[in-house]
Amino acid sequence: MSEQDFREIARNGLWRNNPGLVQLLGLCPLLGTSNSTVNALGLGLATMLVLACSNAAVSLVRGAVSEAIRLPAFVMIIAVLTTCIELLMQAWTYELYQVLGIFIPLITTNCVILGRAEAFAAKNGVLRASFDGLLMGLGFALVLLVLGGLRELLGQGTLLADMHLLFGPAAADWKIQPFPQYQGFLLAILPPGAFIMLGLLIALKNRIDESLAERAKVQAGDVPATQRQRVRVTGVIE
């Protein structure tokens, strides 16, 4: 796989075709667990691992699975990998596993994972499929993390609270409280706040894309005549 392929897959996963901001897949866990940084990071990492491993596994068996049973086979692969992640979390981060609850098993039914298995992994080699899964998972995890951080900051006035649930006792002092007297904003950590914050993130991304597209047109010289500035003989722009 060429360097250009790597860059294209990275751009798609992290920005142009981001699962959370563009495809709008996996909204149930995205909105349900993003009320704090630690919850968002925990589920994001779990989803990223399952997505990368499932893409690799699907790519390996794609030639041995018939068209008739392809989707059930893919779901079984995803379910096995999700169970492995679930067991690891029970062993190493049990308190966080209890907090996330049903959202860990629900990784099996996450449309992001099944969608990439069907649309990409089943049609590409192991290396491309693994990298696509890793970058799509990373893009999803980053949206989760940003959303969780913003909601925690607005809702509780803290950042990185309870990180010991994921990283152990050494992370107990990671908590940041920028505004000690802040009383919190309850709406931010409730489901309606999740919808509002996600909508704002999507709007911000769309605005950035529009600005980049306009800049590219200007640099390419493809600007409508009505928008061009007239330049006098003196060289001064009107």
Swiss-Prot record:
The catalytic activity of this protein is classed by the Enzyme Commission as 7.-.-.-
Q: Where in the cell is it found?
A: Cell inner membrane
**GO biological process annotation, one example:** electron transport chain
> Mind telling me which InterPro entries this protein's record contains?
NqrDE/RnfAE, RnfE
Task: Specify the enzyme's EC class, one word.
Answer: translocase
Which of UniProt's keywords are assigned here? Answer: Cell inner membrane, Cell membrane, Electron transport, Membrane, Translocase, Transmembrane, Transmembrane helix, Transport
The UniProt entry, under HAMAP family, shows: RsxE_RnfE
Q: Which family does it belong to?
A: Belongs to the NqrDE/RnfAE family.
Assembly and interaction partners: The complex is composed of six subunits: RnfA, RnfB, RnfC, RnfD, RnfE and RnfG.
Can you say what this protein is called? Ion-translocating oxidoreductase complex subunit E
Q: To which species is this protein native?
A: Pseudomonas aeruginosa (strain LESB58)
